[in-house]
Amino acid sequence: KINLESYSVGHVWKKNVQCNWKIYWENFSECLHCPNIHPELSDLVPLFKRRLTDIKDHPEWSILKDQNNNPKYQGGLKEGSQTWSYDGSAQGHTIESIQKEMESRGQIYISTWPSMFLGIYGDHIRIVRLIPKGPEEVELIAEWLFEKETINDDNYDKSNVVDFAILVMN
């Protein structure tokens, strides 16, 4: 359970993408392109190296899930990582209420198709809205939410999180 009242918007990013919103969603929903286009993300989330977004996308997932604890076969973040950032570090700030879920999955996604997805990570939440501007253009608006304690910590470098996500979304 997450108490959003304890969060503040730490960064907002907007970009117009020259594609139909349906194409954007399709690209977001699969990971066939991830190893080649997003090598940094595929390193952080080893399952993506296999062009999968969920272990259940593999036809033999029920057999594989019990054979190997490697995140490349089970999902989740690479060993030692806590969040989606350049170095995988949450810099000492984690969302305590979801840590059990984060240990096995690495992230939680909630989509309200066709206009928004929410990513919950080890130390932050990212909301991305898609606003169709025409048949061949969609505006992306991404907002990063951080717990107030995190965003007020002078030692927390939010660019580690924000810049990593922008690299992936760009």
State where each predicted segment sits.
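C-terminal catalytic domain of Rieske-type non-heme iron oxygenases
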Residues: K1-N170
